[in-house]
Amino acid sequence: MRTHFCGLVDETLIGQTVTLAGWTDVARNLGGVCFIDLRDHEGIVQVTVEPAEGDANSAEVFKVAASLGYEDVLQVEGVVRARHAVNDKIRTGKVEVIATRITILNKAAPLPFHAHENPGEDTRLKYRYLDLRRPEMQRMQRTRIKLVQALRRHLDARDFQDIETPILTKATPEGARDFLVPARMHPGEFYALPQSPQLFKQILMVAGFDRYYQIARCFRDEALRADRQLEFTQLDMEFAFVRERDVQDFVEDMIRAIFKEVVDVELAAQFPRMTWAEAMRRYGSDKPDLRIALELVDVAELVKTSEFPVFAAAANDADGRVAALRIPGGATLSRKQIDDYAAHAAKYGAKGLAYIKLSESGEVSSPIAKFFGEEAFAALLAHVGAANGDIVFFGAGSYNKVSDFMGALRLKAGKDFGLVAAGWAPLWVTDFPMFEWDEEAQRYVALHHPFTAPAVDDIADLRANARTAVSRGYDMVLNGNEIGGGSIRIHRPDMQSAVFELLGIGAEEARAKFGFLLDALNYGAPPHGGIAFGIDRIAALMAGTESIRDVIPFPKTTGAQDLMTDAPSPIAAEQLAEVHVQVRPKQA
């Protein structure tokens, strides 16, 4: 139906007849001449219709051109010529196509929005097929496509084997809720959609496949936000007979090569490394954005004897923290703006936010200054490096809570004050805690997942020091986003059973839920490790968008709906009966 793509017509084709196909981006009837911007996936070219007196064919072509509306689908035949007025804004701006025939392949109904408009997200998702025609959306989807293609080429060339793992699998406690699928042939029993291929890829290592990868679809029934979806795509990788640095060095080289190939970005020749403890201490986050130079400063030692009870209590608590965040130039913040910062901190668990503001002349404005003597107050300011014109925020409470909300303030301040440096800041975060204590459940939970190996090989040591145990987990962070997470895995069945026990999973439950894994580990499992990268998140970073929904062709809303297909939707009683499911009426 076509000889060339619209966006690739150039001066080399001048004088030649071409056949194009695409959508009417804009049609302008100026009376004696019609201009059509014809668009396909490669771009736009101008089609010109000039009726010649006494020429029935050109008159008919003009009549068709004059009838066109937005997004009508056309086939155009014509001759390429140089444009009198060059348009430098488009790739084809030096040429135009003089139409000798226009065929309307399909008329478009009146549009809910035009390809060059940016309507509300719900409208975009309801008419996703129109949204995806927009040049910006085409660009972002192409970035994702190039990313996946480049990853496959890179891994295929290095002897990785692309192996599929099951989509219908067993429900296992991996953190988020499972999506459950009723098993028609086994009444009362259910499959689960995989939250990750974690256990299958480990079993592939036991089976002797040395290097595995998969572009895997994963499913988690969890609350949505800009960087989360119910279903998502990850690059899943596993290596046999490796230590942490083997995995990290390989994938660091891979990510560096992929960024250069896909978006022509040169990442650092060597990614910096930081332990989890250091990241939390300095940045209040296990995925710090190193483009922001602001750091947290611990001040507990200076406020242990403070008359301010909130500071003193946290400073004298073994699990407490008192941290300061200095914002250069922050003294310009009004009281309302300071209240906005306090409200932002409250979203992350802060019960209050203390501050000291120093005007350019050195005047102090602070609700906590009265609790300090002159010498202690001066020492506090000196310790945090405060200068005239600065504001210093303080957080006090449990270590993790303070780290969370002060880390969130750091990000907000960085953006509000223009302190986010341009460029790319990759980072390895290592030595994560093995466990964290769940106050509500009154038990340990795995910080990564239950299959991550501890740094110690001795089970008795792990049991005795579970609270402070360090794992062999690692994350790759880029500009404050965790783009990949992995670990060396447990390959001994006795260690795996011990970890289950520490997580409150008894022998009987472990056998019922993970018996297949324990059996596999019993038959000569090699030391192994791996990592998984979030394709959606990396594509969003490459494309320069904050929402992964922009790089997913058909995403769900934050309300977990597909507005285009109207999913989820009710199921007929007959279908439910076939899978032995009965839906209870909603509680009033």
UniProtKB/Swiss-Prot annotation:
According to its UniProt record, the EC number is 6.1.1.12
A single GO CC term, please?
A: cytoplasm
**Gene Ontology terms, MF aspect:** aspartate-tRNA ligase activity; ATP binding; nucleic acid binding
Q: Which domain of life is it from?
A: Bacteria
Query: For the region Aspartate, what residue ranges are annotated?
Result: 198-201
GO terms (BP aspect):
aspartyl-tRNA aminoacylation
Q: Which UniProt keywords apply?
A: Aminoacyl-tRNA synthetase, ATP-binding, Cytoplasm, Ligase, Nucleotide-binding, Protein biosynthesis
Q: Where does ATP bind?
A: 220-222, 229, 482, 534-537
Per UniProt, L-aspartate binds at: 174, 220, 448, 489
| Catalytic activity, reaction form | tRNA(Asp) + L-aspartate + ATP = L-aspartyl-tRNA(Asp) + AMP + diphosphate
Give the UniProt subcellular location, in the record's own words. Cytoplasm
The main place the protein resides is cytoplasm
Family the entry assigns = Belongs to the class-II aminoacyl-tRNA synthetase family. Type 1 subfamily.
What does the function comment of this entry state? Catalyzes the attachment of L-aspartate to tRNA(Asp) in a two-step reaction: L-aspartate is first activated by ATP to form Asp-AMP and then transferred to the acceptor end of tRNA(Asp).
Q: Partners and quaternary state? A: Homodimer.
| Protein name as catalogued | Aspartate--tRNA ligase
* Classification of source organism: Bacteria, Pseudomonadati, Pseudomonadota, Gammaproteobacteria, Lysobacterales
